[in-house]
Amino acid sequence: MPPRSLSNLSFPTEANESELVPEVWEKDFLPDSDGTTAELVIRCVIPSLYLIIISVGLLGNIMLVKIFLTNSAMRNVPNIFISNLAAGDLLLLLTCVPVDASRYFFDEWVFGKLGCKLIPAIQLTSVGVSVFTLTALSADRYRAIVNPMDMQTSGVLLWTSLKAVGIWVVSVLLAVPEAVFSEVARIGSLDNSSFTACIPYPQTDELHPKIHSVLIFLVYFLIPLVIISIYYYHIAKTLIKSAHNLPGEYNEHTKKQMETRKRLAKIVLVFVGCFVFCWFPNHVLYLYRSFNYKEIDPSLGHMIVTLVARVLSFSNSCVNPFALYLLSESFRKHFNSQLCCGRKSYPERSTSYLLSSSAVRMTSLKSNTKNVVTNSVLLNGHSTKQEIAL
């Protein structure tokens, strides 16, 4: 079946969209299948990028999970959440990315009714796990830095694991409507031909795509981002205030603790920044298409924006391990050891201060006109060996 021109479609291209990665088939942007440069780029370069994303993402996330599972000193609150992020990314890389890549080789939806129900729900579940876990990580950083005395000290790892499971349950439940309403449909063209597509909402009117895109944007992007921003506003305010209240005689000790706090918060903030950077273009594009449901944009610029948004959104599933590699000395050492199949074990009490909110010495500073009282508390639900482990 030759590629179709957008001008021949009698049904809006949004009918092909999945919930977060727009499903406008790139062949619809192309002229006839005559080996043009545009066609070669789309059918060869883009799938190659997908292959790189899958390969790099699998390597990084599998290594990350393996390191956390095989090193007892790495099992703490933030690392449980980070492993949760990696699990969600692996789910997306193993299912949704290959399915999306297949659209560059097939003219129609080839995964049947069951695939049409499962794939959109799986993708939405993965995105939910990512954004809700980032919110939970930010909340953990808030408690560790702003209210360190309120941190739970017993059963913290079990409680955190239950939270991680809860995130998956909520994400799956929120994705159920996607599985219910997604269906395989025949999309007609003005040239009297038709093709099969998986559509995420009923074809009845223009209201469904608008409601769908707005809810997706609010639940999976804007609301979590607002919550995270509030947490980090208070974190920044606390860090700035603590920096001004540091007593001179405790300078070296408190300076090291302050650097620990900043680094812990920085790692989570980098994860959030990567998520926003990778997913924001896709959300904007989906909103634009949903509110211009009957208008088709066949321009080259729109095609490029679509491709970039899609590649960026999937790239988010492979960036977290590399961000952690750059920011965490402990993780970097373990990663290099695993990659080289080495047997060298690194001391658990590293000189680097990294990701252990459940095991970091937090200092509560209270000043008055004559003195400063410094209370150091070891917030650890497991053992002192986790004090500065990743």
Swiss-Prot record:
It is a multi-pass membrane protein. Its main location: membrane. Disulfide bonds join 116-198. Gene3D superfamilies: Rhodopsin 7-helix transmembrane proteins (1.20.1070.10). Coiled coil: none annotated. It holds the Pfam family 7tm_1. It comes from the Eukaryota. Residues 1-41, 100-117, 178-211, 288-299 are extracellular. One of its GO terms (molecular function) is bombesin receptor activity. Residues 66-79, 140-156, 236-266, 328-390 are cytoplasmic. Expressed in a subset of neurons of the pre-Botzinger complex. Within the pre-Botzinger complex, there is some overlap with neurons expressing Grpr with some cells expressing only Grpr or Nmbr while some cells express both. Expressed in dorsal root ganglion neurons and mast cells. Expressed in lung. GO terms for cellular component: cytosol; plasma membrane. Disruption phenotype: Reduction in rate of basal sighing without affecting the respiratory rate. Significantly reduced sneezing responses to chemical and allergen stimuli. Glycans are attached at residues 8, 16, 192. It is found in: Cell membrane. InterPro entries: Bombsn_rcpt-like, GPCR_Rhodpsn, GPCR_Rhodpsn_7TM, NeuroB_rcpt. The chain crosses the membrane at residues 42-65, 80-99, 118-139, 157-177, 212-235, 267-287, 300-327. Belongs to the G-protein coupled receptor 1 family. This is Neuromedin-B receptor.
